Design a protein with these regions (language model features):
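Ligand/cofactor pocket segment of small-molecule handling proteins
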Residues: 106, 114-119, 125-210
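Active-site/binding-pocket entry motifs
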Residues: 17-18, 203, 222
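Residues that line or immediately flank small-molecule/substrate-binding pockets and catalytic motifs
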Residues: 15, 50, 111, 174, ...
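Conserved small/polar residues in nucleotide/adenosyl-binding loops
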Residues: 213-220
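Active-site beta->alpha loop and helix N-cap motifs at the rims of alpha/beta catalytic domains
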Residues: 2-152
Length: 222
């Protein structure tokens, strides 16, 4: 069963997961942070459990609780995007299903972090995205990692992932403006409806000025 496709054309802040001094999740702080971000009309989603949200440091039950808390912070009005970080495909599918059940409407699909050092077999990323959508219906964001890692997708891989059902967005953090300037136009031409999001700190102006669309996912602290 597919999840309704949210329009993420706007600002997509990535709030941190706040903690109490004794290391517990600070749910009142989540309510304050999420409800405040939800007051801005430019904010089209809250991206949780990514790098800023420390999703990989949380237990499964904590991940679910964080998603539910951010959904509740805006009474479901602002879509919640959940980072999907599980290493194996089956693990990622199960994580994505928990995210759907908790109220997430899209997933930021991380590459398997085992690929960071050793790279990936051809077709493995495509299988990851395909399985997640086919088994959970979660809308997917193609996550392009920095160029200096071994899990940065070549253009052909990006095009093949973007062509898959359920992939409606790409968050690009390639951090190589030669690749941005040559690959983004190809993606845009091949998939005019693909929402292109920049997460470049050091190249933010470049990626906004040269993009027809103004979208960015940034860390947000309470």
């Amino acid at each position: 069963m597919s999840v309704p496709v949210p329009n993420l054309r706007g600002l997509n802040p990535a709030p941190v997961t706040p903690f109490t001094p004794d290391g517990q999740i600070d749910f009142p702080a989540i309510e304050r942070l999420g409800s405040w971000l939800g007051t801005f009309p430019e904010v089209t989603s809250l991206v949780v459990l990514g790098h800023a949200g420390e999703g990989t440091f949380l237990t499964q039950s904590e991940q679910v609780a964080v998603i539910e808390a951010f959904v509740a912070s805006t009474a479901g009005r602002v879509p919640v995007v959940a980072g999907i970080t599980g290493e194996g495909t089956k693990v990622a599918v199960e994580e994505a299903q928990r995210a759907v059940d908790a109220g997430a409407t899209a997933g930021l699909i991380y590459p398997s972090h085992g690929w960071l050092r050793f790279g990936f077999q051809p077709g493995a990323p495509q299988d990851r995205y395909r399985a997640i959508y086919e088994e959970t219906g979660l809308n997917e964001i193609l996550f392009q990692y920095p160029d200096n890692t071994k899990c940065s997708y070549d253009l052909d891989t990006q095009l093949e992932i973007a062509a898959l059902p359920g992939v409606h967005y790409t968050k690009n953090g390639v951090r190589n403006m030669k690749r941005w300037d040559t690959e983004i136009p190809v993606l845009r031409q091949a998939f005019p409806e693909l929402t292109i999001m920049s997460c470049h700190d050091e190249y933010l102006l470049h990626t906004l000025v040269r993009s027809e669309e103004r979208r960015v996912g940034k860390e947000c602290r309470s």
